[in-house]
A protein has these predicted regions:
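Long, ordered, helix-rich scaffold segments
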Residues: 1-162
């Protein structure tokens, strides 16, 4: 069931929301399946949907999502940031804003997980100018955060200055 859903869902323009909902209903009591459910939606190809990042962000409000659970947080946020290059590098920079917002939020709860999310920025200087400028703004949002953990400050130093 999982493999079939993945092959249908990820690259299709069709949302298959009925299949996604069915998978959730059948597996909502299995933690690993819930992580997969969030991850699958995070890696879907956006097909030019300008609200795609908003849709991913709205999944954080789902009753089964708990950002304090590291596996659940990474299944949605980590999957989007590391595995969805089209969504992450959206034309309006919303993917970078989503990343920065979540790094700052997770840093207050779990600095180790936040610093691992920071690794997504290691290659920002290789982006073309348009994307590099947007990414840099997100990096400076994180940099200006009060009470940022030592873990994230160290990563930020490496990312910005090396």
């Amino acid at each position: 069931q999982w493999a079939s859903l993945c092959s249908l869902y990820i690259k299709s323009k069709h949302t298959y929301q009925d299949l996604i909902n069915d998978f959730y209903d059948r597996n909502k009591h299995e933690e690993i399946s819930l992580d997969r459910w969030f991850s699958l939606q995070a890696i879907k190809y956006p097909h030019g949907d300008e609200r795609f990042v908003q849709k991913i962000n709205s999944l954080k409000e789902h009753k089964s999502f708990n950002i304090e659970n590291p596996n659940r947080g990474m299944s949605l946020i980590g999957s989007f940031c590391f595995a969805n290059i089209y969504g992450f590098h959206s034309n309006d920079g919303s993917g970078y804003d989503f990343w920065a917002q979540n790094v700052m939020e997770i840093d207050r709860l779990n600095p180790q997980i936040a610093s691992s999310l920071m690794k997504r920025a290691m290659d920002w200087k290789r982006l073309n100018k348009k994307y590099r400028v947007m990414f840099e703004k997100s990096l400076h949002k994180i940099e200006s955060t009060q009470n940022l953990s030592i873990n994230c400050r160290e990563m930020l130093k490496v990312i910005l200055f090396e």
